[in-house]
UniProtKB/Swiss-Prot annotation:
Top-level EC class as recorded in UniProt: transferase
Name of the encoding gene: proB
Principal location listed in the UniProt entry: cytoplasm
InterPro entries cross-referenced by the UniProt entry: AceGlu_kinase-like_sf (IPR036393), Asp/Glu/Uridylate_kinase (IPR001048), G5K_ProB (IPR041739), Glu/AcGlu_kinase (IPR001057), Glu_5kinase (IPR011529), Glu_5kinase/COase_Synthase (IPR005715), Glutamate_5-kinase_CS (IPR019797)
Binding site for ATP: 15, 178-179, 220-226
Organism: Streptococcus pyogenes serotype M4 (strain MGAS10750)
Name of the featured protein: Glutamate 5-kinase
GO cellular component: a single term: cytosol
Catalytic reactions of this protein: L-glutamate + ATP = L-glutamyl 5-phosphate + ADP
CDD domains the UniProt entry points to: AAK_G5K_ProB
Taxonomy of the source species: Bacteria, Bacillati, Bacillota, Bacilli, Lactobacillales
Length: 273
């Protein structure tokens, strides 16, 4: 087994999905958010630079507006996300403050990173915030993003957004928290003998084909989007860990080299024992 080496990792992007922030009841998982804030603050205190890509605006909005289902109308979806984004950032700010960590909000659309001038501006914003010891919290700007063929400004989901942010900021590692343990050789909800892949060095067509499927009730990203994100990370010569977000403290164990989740790193860059 390849040994994971994260001693030289300084800049980390952590992506947390809606399914990790919102309980099956639709209520906000306050305990999970508190644990995440503790872990990120602990990493910051150790000299790490952390960027958080957080889904959840829709889930927060549904909770606040006491709506049981995600609206099908685009304008209503944008309205619910807009309400939820404010609530989510307010909660993040309060909980991170408990650990004496300051946070900021960056809302992105795809066109911001496509055009060189706006890309340079957002890159400078990230660097300035990081230099001030602030944790940038990133989400897609759902209230204004569109997915029209002639002017598509959506990333698709926050799995891909996190890979884009990792590329923009030249992060050493992307940690993707999800409601699954990692990438399996086949669907673990169907096959009892499914095996977790500890390390993926090459994303094959077989892996892509087996990664189909939708996201959670409150989110949009499925396994395919996570594989596509890993491909983007590979293109930027980076590395990614896909792991279960049930216990955010496991992030610390991963950074110690423990083999949790699936580690995506190209084989030519892997050091052997």
């Amino acid at each position: 087994m390849m040994k994971r080496q994260f001693e030289d990792v300084t800049r980390i992007v952590i992506k947390i999905g809606t399914s990790s922030l919102v309980l099956p009841t639709g209520k906000i998982n306050l305990e999970k958010i508190d644990q995440l804030a503790f872990v990120i603050s602990s990493l910051m205190n150790k000299g790490k630079e952390v960027i958080l890509v957080s889904s959840g605006a829709m889930g927060f909005g549904l909770d606040i507006l006491k709506m049981e289902k995600r609206p099908t109308n685009l304008a209503k979806q944008q309205a619910v996300s807009s309400v939820g984004q404010v609530a989510m950032m307010s909660l993040y700010s309060q909980i991170f403050a408990h650990y004496q960590t300051n946070v900021s909000q960056i809302l992105l659309t795809r066109d911001v990173v496509v055009f060189p001038e706006s890309l340079a501006n957002v890159t400078n914003a990230f660097e300035s915030l990081i230099s001030l010891g602030i944790v940038p919290i990133v989400n897609e700007n759902d209230a204004v993003s569109v997915d029209e063929m002639d002017h598509a400004t959506k990333f698709g989901d926050n799995d891909r957004l996190s890979a884009v942010v990792a590329g923009i900021t030249k992060a050493d590692l992307l940690i993707m928290l999800s409601d699954i343990d990692g990438l399996f050789d086949k669907n673990p909800t169907i096959y009892e003998d499914a095996q977790l892949r500890s390390h993926v060095a090459v994303i094959t067509q077989e892996i892509i084909a087996s990664a189909g499927g939708a996201g959670s009730k409150f989110g949009t990203g499925g396994m395919l989007s996570k594989i596509q994100s890993a491909q983007m990370v590979f293109e930027n010569k980076g590395q990614m860990v896909l792991m279960n977000g049930a216990n955010p403290r496991d992030i610390l164990r991963v950074l110690e080299g423990q083999p949790l989740g699936t580690w995506f790193k190209q084989i030519e860059e892997v050091r052997h024992d």
